[in-house]
Amino acid sequence: MSNPLPEAQSAQTRRRALVASLTGSSIEWFDYFLYGTAAALVFNKLFFPNFDPVVGLLLAYLSFSLTFFIRPIGGVLFAHIGDRIGRKKTLVITLSLMGGATVLIGCLPTYEHIGVWAPILLILLRVVQGLGIGGEWGGALLLAYEYAPAKRKGLFGSVPQVGVTLGMLLATLAVSLMAMLPEDDFLAWGWRVPFILSAGLVFLGLWIRHGLDETPDFKQAKASGNVSKMPVLETLRDHWREVLIAAGLKVVETAPFYIFSTFVVSYAVNNLGYAKGSALNAVMIGALVASLLIPVMGWLSDRIGRKRVYLSLIHISEPTRRRG
C-alpha cells in the first residue's frame, strides 16, 4: 500500500484538481451557452430563413434542445469510459469534442450559401456538443468530488457547478460585445467570432488537464483490480432508485434555469421590446450572482446537510417561477 501524500502536497494536488475541474467546466459551458444565445438572436435568421420568424425561432430552439436528449447518452457513454480508462483521459476527450464542434459551428456556411445542408450540419454539430457536455458534466463533478476531503465534499462538488454559470456569463458577455456591431455586421460575421476564438480556451483547458493526475479513488480501484467491465449496467441494476431520485431532483431546478438563461433573451427582445444589450446584461448579472452563491451553498451543505439546502432553495425559488 502506498504512503499517503504529505499534507502540503495533498493540498496542492487538490487545488490543481479544482482548477482543472473549474476551467474545463467553464470552457465547455461557455461553448454550450454560446449556442443558446446565438439560437436566441441569429440562428433563425441564418439557418432557418425560409420560415415564419416565430417558426424559425422555434426551430432554432429545437436544435438547442436536442442536447437534452443527447446529454444523457453522452453521460452514460462517458461514465462507462471514465470507469474503464480513468477520469483524466475521459475529460480530455469530452473537452476536445465540445471545443471542436463549437469552432466548426463558427465556420459553418449559412442557408444562403449551401441551402438545407446548413441546418443539417448545424444540428449534427449540436449533437456532438451534447455528447461532449454530457460526459463533461459528470466527469468534472466526479473529479472534484473524488479529490475532496471527507468533510468538504459539498464545497468541492460545487466548484464545477460554478463553471456552468461562469461559462454562461462569459458566453453572454462575448455575444453582448459582438452585438454592439451594426446589425448587418453582427449577422454577417460578428456572431462567429466567439465560436472561433473559443479554440484558444479549449487548448488552455487541455493543457491544464494534461498535467493532472488520476483521482486517488480510480488509482486505488485499478490497483486492486476492482474495475467493473460494465459499470453503467451495474449502477442501474444495484442503484436504480438513487438514479431516479437524482434525475428527478435535477429536473426540478434545470427546467427554470434554462428558461431564465436562454429563452428569456429572445422573449425580452422580440416580445417586450428590450434592446439585445439590456437582455444580455440581465442574464450576465444573474450568472454573476449565481457564480458567487454556488460555492457558498456547497459550503453550507457541508455544515447543515444537502437535503436542507436543496429543499430550502427550491422553496425560495418557487415564487419566482410562478411569476415567470
Language model regions located:
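Extracytoplasmic gate region of multi-pass secondary transporters
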Residues: 36, 241-286
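Extracellular/periplasmic helix-loop-helix junction of adjacent transmembrane segments
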Residues: 40-71
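Central cavity-lining transmembrane alpha-helices of secondary-active solute carriers
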Residues: 62-80, 101, 284-296
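Cytoplasmic membrane-interface "Motif A"-like loop-to-helix N-cap segments
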Residues: 84-95, 303-313
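Hydrophobic core of transmembrane alpha-helices in multi-pass small-molecule transporters
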Residues: 115-133
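Glycine-rich segments within core transmembrane alpha-helices of 12-TM secondary carriers
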Residues: 155-176
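Flexible cytoplasmic inter-helical loops of multi-pass small-molecule transporters
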Residues: 210-231
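Residue-level detector of conserved catalytic or cofactor/ligand-binding positions
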Residues: 312-320, 324
